[in-house]
Swiss-Prot record:
This is ATPase GET3. Belongs to the arsA ATPase family. Homodimer. GO terms for cellular component: GET complex.
Amino acid sequence: MSSAALVPADDILEPTLQSILDQKSLRWIFVGGKGGVGKTTTSCSLAIQLAKVRKSVLLISTDPAHNLSDAFGQKFGKEARLVDGFDNLSAMEIDPSASMQDLLAAGGEQGEDMGFGLGGMMQDLAFSIPGVDEAMSFAEVLKQVKSLSYEVIVFDTAPTGHTLRFLQFPTVLEKGLAKLSQLSNQFGPMLNSVLGARGGLPGGQNLDEVLSKMESLRETISEVNAQFKDADLTTFVCVCIAEFLSLYETERMIQELTSYQIDTHAIVVNQLLFPGKDSTCEQCKARRKMQKKYLDEIAELYEDFNVVRMPLLVEEVRGKEKLER
């Protein structure tokens, strides 16, 4: 492909996501879209810019295929760690399957020792729940957010379908815990007497203690769920490329976000070509023509959105310096 069709890495195109940087009330920022459209690059760049204007920023990857470590060139894990070169930007990569294993390990072995067969049964049940990986990601996020104080949190999310389930999880879990609490009020005394006769729950807890912890979790989730639906506190940045499938996924995502009452008003269109008039690259010109068609559709569909057009660069966007541009 002719380099004349690309924009050098030093060039910067307007508009930007400046409105998000200026909105000082924002606490939760989600970045999502179809796989391979540049979500991680966008979320990393946004987090770096936020670190310039906010006291403390946490960047979290909830995608099982983590890319934050590759993007910044340093290793991240499930504990928040400062990004090299920053004193107010931290990052973490949540491993959902490992989180689930940790959760089950403590109670599972005790359950087996008691003869209930709880370990294997609970593990099979837990992993059969749709969206359980997003559920564990959310639980891990809550744990980190409660123990550490960050002014704004940026989520580098999984591909579209997983992201939407992740965002729906607070509502689903809140309803589920409320129903469980209702059932416990009706059948709690009877269950306590049965469990008491058989030695109680794993770890020596009784049902009331477990339900009390779950109620506390429900209250926390209810609070976060309310924040997710507050446009002053939460927004979702959609990332796409100027192709049919990506645009289709973006439209579906925006409709679902609207149904969840989650604010979204910014779209980043990545990998755009800008061939010069004297370019001899026919493939570049043809692709630019196709991209322009979908850019026109985006402009028509989302006239009230801040649409950010980003070029296809001549080099990989890796490392603090390139991400900062």
